[in-house]
C-alpha cells in the first residue's frame, strides 16, 4: 500500500506528499532492515528532490553504508546538516535526523580508525534518536561499544550492549544488539561469547521474519568461529547459506563470509570450489561497486593464490596494492597479514625485512586498540618470520604469546594455516608448556597439511613426557579394544608388562581409565 501511494503521489506531482510517505514509513522499514526497499523508493524521486530532502538523503546513506560506498557519504551528510541548519524542519524531527547523521559519522570515523570521534558521535546520537528507532540506536551502541573496547574497557563495552536501560522494543531489537555483541566478542578474541550470541539469534530465526541482515550476520559470526576452531563442516554449512543471500547482506558480511568459505574448501582439498567462490566474490564486488569491498576481494584473491602455489599472482597484487596498516580489521579477513605472508613466501632478506615492518606496525596498532583476535594472528605470523630468520628464541616467544591469547577461545586454524614450520615450533614449545592439551589439539589438526604419521609424532613430542615407541604401540592396540592378554600376544610381551605400559601412558596423559586414555590420546593427536 505504501509503495503504491508513493507512486500515485509522484505521478500526480505531489512531491511533498511523497516525501512525507517515505518519512512516515522510514522508521518501520529501518527497523525491519529494509534498506534495499528504501533505496528503491528514493530512486523514484527526481534527483533534484532526493538530493535536498534529509529523509531521502539519509535513506541513501544507509544503502551506501551497507554496500560500503563510503567515499560518497560525507557530502550527503554535509548536505543534510546544511538543510537542518536552515531551521525549517520541526525541532523534534530535526533532532532525530541530526542523531542519524551522527551515527553515520560514527561509522565513518570507526572505519578510518578514529575511535575517539566515533565513540563521541555515537554517544551524541543516542541522546537524540528516539527509542522507537531501535535499529539506529543499536547501530550507535555498536560504535559506542567498539570505542570502549578500543580503550581497553571491555566491561563497559559489553554493558553498552547487554545492560541496556531503556524500554524493551521486542525480540528483533534484542537480537540486533546480540549481533553487535558478536563483533565485540570477536575483536576481544572471545569465540565462546560469539558462539553464544550468534546461536541465540539463530535459535529465533523463524521469528525474525524480514530481519535478513541480522540472520546473515549471525550465521557469518558463528561460521567464523567454527572455522577458527577447525570445525569445518559446520562452517561450510552456514557460509554456503549466506553467500546465496549476498544481495541482501551487508557487503562486509558477504566478503568476509565468502573468504571464510573459500578457505574452508581450500583446507579440505576442494581447490576448484575455493577458486569459484573467490571468482564470484570479485565479480560481485565489481558489479555492486565501491572501492572497499573490491579491494578486500582482490586482497583475498591474492591470499588464495599464495595458498595454491601461484606466488607470481600473489606478488603482483602485493606490489600494486597499498594496504592500510592502521585501520581496524574487526572481521574474519585481514589483508595486512596476506601482504606479510606473501613477502615471507618470497623469502629474500629484503622481503623478510619488509614483512617484519608490516607485521610490527599492524601488531602495534591492533594491540593499541585491544583487538586480540588480530594480535593472535600477527604474533603467529611473526613467529613464522623469526623461524625463517633462524631466530628460534624470538619465534618461540612470539608463538607462546599467541597461544596464551588463543587458548581461551580455542583458536586452531590460525596456527595450522601457517604450515609445517609452525608445527615444528609448536612441538618444541610443548616441552616448555608441559602436557598441554591445547598445543596437542592444534598439532592434531595438522594432518591436513602434514602426513598423519608426522602429525602424531609432533603431537607426542609436545607432551611433557613423550610416550615411548612401545607405549605408542600399546596405545594403538588399546584404541582397537584389545585386552591386556591380546596386546601381550600381539607384541610378544607379558600381560604384566602391558599393564605397566598402560599405567605409564595414563600418568603421562594425566588421566585414569582405558576409555579416557584413548579419548584423550585422540584429542591430543596421538591417534587417528
Predicted stretch roles:
Residues 1-67, 72-76, 354:
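Extended alpha-helical scaffolding segments used for macromolecular assembly and cargo binding
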Residues 2, 15, 35, 70, ...:
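TPR-repeat structural position
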Residues 6, 26-27, 39-47, 78-90, ...:
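Amphipathic alpha-helical segments of tetratricopeptide repeats
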Residues 13-15, 78-83, 393-410, 420, ...:
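TPR/TPR-like (Sel1-like) alpha-helical repeat modules
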Residues 19-28, 55-70, 97-113, 135-153, ...:
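Tandem amphipathic alpha-helical repeat scaffolds
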Residues 444-476:
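Regulatory hinge/linker segments at domain boundaries
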Residues 473, 481-516, 520:
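Recognition helix of helix-turn-helix DNA-binding domains
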